[in-house]
Amino acid sequence: MATETEVVAPVTVSNGGSKGCCKYGGPGYATPLAAMSGPSEKLIYVTAVYTGTGIDKPDYLATVDVDPSSPSYSSVIHRLPMPFVGDELHHSGWNSCSSCHGDASVDRRYLVLPSLISGRIYAIDTKENPRAPSLYKYVDPKEIADKTGLAFPHTAHCLATGEILVSCLGDEEGNAKGNGFLLLDSDFNIKNRWEKPGHSPLYGYDFWYQPRHKTMISTSWGAPKAFSKGFNLQHVADGLYGSHLHVYSWPGGEIKQLIDLGPTGLLPLEIRFLHDPSKDTGFVGSALSSNMIRFFKNSDETWSHEVVISVKPLKVENWILPEMPGLITDFLISLDDRFIYFVNWLHGDIRQYNIEDPKNPVLTGQIWVGGLLQKGSPVKAVGEDGNTFQFEVPQIKGKSLRGGPQMIQLSLDGKRLYATNSLFSAWDRQFYPEIMEKGSHIIQIDVDTEKGGLTINPDFFVDFGDEPDGPSLAHEMRYPGGDCTSDIWI
């Protein structure tokens, strides 16, 4: 980890006293379908990382112009450096979202940036100047650890109460058993742990709540002391990575059921319920097993699961293992619950499935946009006939695509899919050392929402290899008005 050196003094402004939901006119949209009719995105906020790259600079929030009519389209128009070096910005969320749509006093103003390595949680003011966000305040990791024992914050979701819930993946020493959920008030003051004593998950990562079913489900990555050093398959055998879903009472915070996904669900990372708040089903992406798993509620109020999509590993030459998993590291669901999109970070493809029948997804689109098996790579896949093959990956604006597709974001209308290619600096260095030297990038894919299908937009390419302080790693993306992975309806 880089030395923590303060470079900017934090500033403080009023939050406006945002509280719970009671009337209409708050942030977001009344329903997921209403959100689909929202305005087209003009800006995207992207976490950009120097931690772990060898460049001794703070991570930053990049603002990217995604308005095709703008002269600065497809470029970074603003960079907000964090106050310290060594954070590892990763995921992001909002102080309020569509779960607070009923409260006119609530404002979607602050982008929440948990720092996975340093443990800080930043609040970024995006309202005063959306094209040039500013730092509002940050939550100190020592205060978090002293009051709750938590460290390694990851996913942030806004609650209908105006509070913010953040999953934390371990304790200060990097042990998974110290993980749990941090509850912040509307002005980012630490309240306590959200879960009841004795009800912490085995491992932490992502979570999603569905209030009408009085349920929150969380997933499992692994022990920070393991994953922060890169991926070691032996650590899976040693029990340092997870394979469980934790079913919590909502908002009670008690574990009601522990679902063991077994070998079909190693490293279950991102989780999403269907957006329709009345639905009692959703999906989780198992990274190492490379399965999409559907979970669903039974008539007796318990929950079950089934594998509905399986990405088979490919036999390969010139790699660290004889077989290569796809490594599903991110997925999302369109706001109308018709399509699911997921990435295979190692294989290099993005897939689109129709999930109108959630039990039986149908492949409707697939496109290769990087990966270890693209033409020109030393790694080759081996077919059943013994012949080797690689995938054709196009250039965009004369640039070759580096790394593999990682975080994705979908436009509200479902017609534009954005993708970055950095997972986590230690893993990037291990699997895709090229992006440590040349930086990562954002691409945009046009989506056919009628028949299905994915096509690269040849006019959009944001190259983080050209950044003023050197190549950086772009990770999660957010629109100022919310999106299909930030907003939850109640």
UniProtKB/Swiss-Prot annotation:
InterPro entries: Se-bd (IPR008826). Selenite binds at residues 21-22. GO terms for molecular function: selenium binding. The lineage of its organism: Eukaryota, Viridiplantae, Streptophyta, Embryophyta, Tracheophyta. The gene is SBP1. Binds cadmium and mediates lower sensitivity to stress requiring glutathione (GSH) for tolerance (e.g. cadmium, selenate, and hydrogen peroxide excess). Probably helps to detoxify cadmium potentially through direct binding. Binds selenium, cadmium, zinc and nickel in vitro. Expressed in seedlings, roots, leaves, stems and flowers. PANTHER family: METHANETHIOL OXIDASE, SELENIUM-BINDING PROTEIN 1. The modification N-acetylalanine is found at residue 2. It holds the Pfam family SBP56. Belongs to the selenium-binding protein family. Induction: Induced by cadmium (at protein level). Induced by selenium (selenate), copper and hydrogen peroxide H(2)O(2) (at protein level). The induction in response to sulfur starvation is repressed by glutathione (GSH) (at protein level). Interacts with GRXS14 and GRXS16. Interacts with DALL3. It comes from Arabidopsis thaliana. GO terms for biological process: cellular response to selenium ion; response to cadmium ion; response to hydrogen peroxide; sulfate assimilation. GO terms for cellular component: cytosol; plasmodesma. This is Selenium-binding protein 1. Keywords: Acetylation, Selenium. The keyword Acetylation applies.
